[in-house]
């Protein structure tokens, strides 16, 4: 990966857990293809990459009744098919199930099932200042999908940098915590002077509730802030990161994982 473009490498990995196995699926943008890997121990060895036929970016998996569904966005349509997650074989024809609400680049799809509804969550607008999260639902996994009349359910399109330091919110996933509370994780950036955001895309967390019409509502009004009231989660202090690493146990910590090959001139070993 030396010399790889900033637009290269892998995009938008999604991890799912099913029947004792962790699956991670993603897009290799450099080689123009999707693949998945799996393991029973996410801190251990993973399988070799398994190529996936259906194109597009931001693939995601959904498991139900012994079937594995793949959703991605070839040709800017959210598209569904069944696959064999162990071999990557595509078992059904790809079917277009939603094109979004009209924003450009409908992508980042995820499917969930709650109270006999299939929910399809996507991002639109591109990972820039027009980014937004929209959602649709259906009684059937392959549609037809009806969109939420309150879309977008999260965006900062209408908030400038003076009113909100968080911009470009999108590419979300929804999870349920062990205490049955609901949450969304998503990306955003924090621009500084001249609209530069040197930290790049950051990961944020916000609470979710379900309204009387069974649609998800993010942080009460579809916007987020740097500090949000989340009383259901206990405080989790972060341990101080070591400035010196001892290699006696033969294992490297996660801080040694790099997006690309490290620059050896930045490190000293003695």
Regions found by a protein language model. Name each.
Residues 1-270:
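Carbohydrate-active catalytic/glycan-binding domains of CAZyme proteins
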């Amino acid at each position: 990966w030396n010399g790889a473009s900033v637009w290269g490498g892998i995009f938008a990995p999604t991890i799912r857990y099913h029947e004792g196995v962790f699956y991670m699926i993603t897009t290799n943008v450099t080689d123009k293809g999707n693949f998945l890997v799996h393991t029973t121990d996410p801190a251990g060895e993973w399988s070799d990459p398994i190529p996936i036929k259906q194109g597009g970016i931001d693939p995601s998996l959904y498991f139900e009744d012994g079937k594995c569904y793949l959703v991605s966005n070839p040709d800017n349509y959210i598209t569904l098919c069944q696959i064999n997650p162990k071999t990557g074989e595509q078992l059904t024809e790809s079917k277009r199930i939603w094109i979004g609400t009209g924003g450009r680049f409908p992508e980042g799809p995820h499917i969930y099932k709650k109270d006999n509804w299939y929910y399809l969550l996507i991002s639109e607008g591109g990972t820039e200042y027009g980014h937004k999260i929209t959602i649709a639902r259906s009684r059937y996994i392959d549609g037809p999908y009806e969109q939420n009349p309150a879309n977008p359910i999260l965006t900062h399109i209408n908030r400038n940098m003076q009113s909100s330091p968080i911009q470009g919110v999108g590419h979300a996933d929804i999870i349920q915590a062990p205490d049955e509370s609901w949450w969304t994780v998503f990306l955003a950036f924090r621009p500084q002077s001249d609209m530069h955001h040197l930290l790049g895309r950051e990961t944020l967390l916000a609470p979710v509730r379900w309204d009387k019409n069974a649609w998800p509502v993010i942080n009460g009004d579809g916007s987020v802030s740097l500090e949000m009231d989340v009383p259901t989660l206990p405080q989790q202090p972060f341990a101080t990161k070591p400035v010196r690493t001892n290699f006696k146990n033969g294992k490297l910590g996660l801080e040694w994982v790099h997006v690309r090959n490290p620059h050896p001139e930045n490190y000293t070993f003695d």
